[in-house]
């Protein structure tokens, strides 16, 4: 595996004689709230030492502060921070990164949404804490900067698919891996024609068939951009070539990923769709947390279906593969262009299929960004260029 996996470690960073200290970034989002439930259910294993949020849900954040008793808090929105009326709250665009640098934690769970999580991710790695990574965009955007900053085993994925791969890879060595297989539910529009997608509304795109997620992740799942991001994340985490990473549609979302080994055997990780399982595993890695989620019930009849992805109707995965192979900052361009186009759809400016078309158009003009980034500023420059170009294309569409 080129570059080597960044998650495999036989012992963790933590002192097992005391609860693991968790710093939670993105505490008011879907992953963040579920992580707090995992912590609350296991007070002998985990304790929260800090919270960070964007500021969109101040009432929830205030309640979380009261319930956890933390004094280390960061809020990106200064007005939201002021409304908390609590002393010592860090605020502003650099507040979350500052919180990471000034809070002693064993595990930093980055559940922020979007590429704004890049600098907190790098700060967490620099601190020496284990990084439980739900913010896939920071890895996709930062690419080699993130993997170079990580010690072996320092990054543990929270995404269910990558958590599944990490578990399956315990069953073999790196040189025995033939292919990695990511599963996708297919989203709410599985089986739809391209023409039918023209009429999709934001409300329809926000109804995921099997998972409960935040609005942007749900939309990204509907376009299959989320699976494209996960494809890139898989390559970066596990060092497997893009041509050896497959995507298959599995509507039930029970099998989360599979690993095929060179002897022809395939290991799969299966569990009912519940993010508390990969969250608990990432917080406690390499140990499992008893009762983290319900298990599969094999006493009743059930069917697990697998089918090929229709890449003609949903080209986002192929685009991600091309961006990844292109190298440099092209994956950052892919992510940034999507964030702009996806928001434009949610705002009613463009139609649903135009999201991925905008990403494709921006990538087609992005050859100058194929050089490997030397600094965070290089990534931010590519990100900024892609956002501006996507805005121009969206404006033309509108």
Curated annotation (Swiss-Prot):
Its cofactor is Mg(2+); Mn(2+). One of its GO terms (molecular function) is 1-deoxy-D-xylulose-5-phosphate reductoisomerase activity. Keywords: Isoprene biosynthesis, Manganese, Metal-binding, NADP, Oxidoreductase. Its EC number is 1.1.1.267. NADPH binds at residues 28-31, 54, 57, 135, 137, 214. Pathway: Isoprenoid biosynthesis; isopentenyl diphosphate biosynthesis via DXP pathway; isopentenyl diphosphate from 1-deoxy-D-xylulose 5-phosphate: step 1/6. One of its GO terms (biological process) is isopentenyl diphosphate biosynthetic process, methylerythritol 4-phosphate pathway involved in terpenoid biosynthetic process. Gene3D superfamilies: 1.10.1740.10, NAD(P)-binding Rossmann-like Domain. Pfam families: DXP_redisom_C, DXP_reductoisom, DXPR_C. 1-deoxy-D-xylulose 5-phosphate binds at residues 136, 160-161, 185, 208, 221, 226-227, 230. It is an enzyme of class 1 (oxidoreductase). Mn(2+) binds at residues 159, 161, 230. It catalyses: 2-C-methyl-D-erythritol 4-phosphate + NADP(+) = 1-deoxy-D-xylulose 5-phosphate + NADPH + H(+). InterPro entries: DXP_reductoisomerase, DXP_reductoisomerase_C, DXP_reductoisomerase_N, DXPR_C, DXPR_C_sf, NAD(P)-bd_dom_sf. The keyword Repeat does not apply. The keyword Oxidoreductase applies. Catalyzes the NADPH-dependent rearrangement and reduction of 1-deoxy-D-xylulose-5-phosphate (DXP) to 2-C-methyl-D-erythritol 4-phosphate (MEP). NCBIfam families: Dxr. Belongs to the DXR family. This is 1-deoxy-D-xylulose 5-phosphate reductoisomerase. It comes from Rhodococcus jostii (strain RHA1). The gene is dxr.
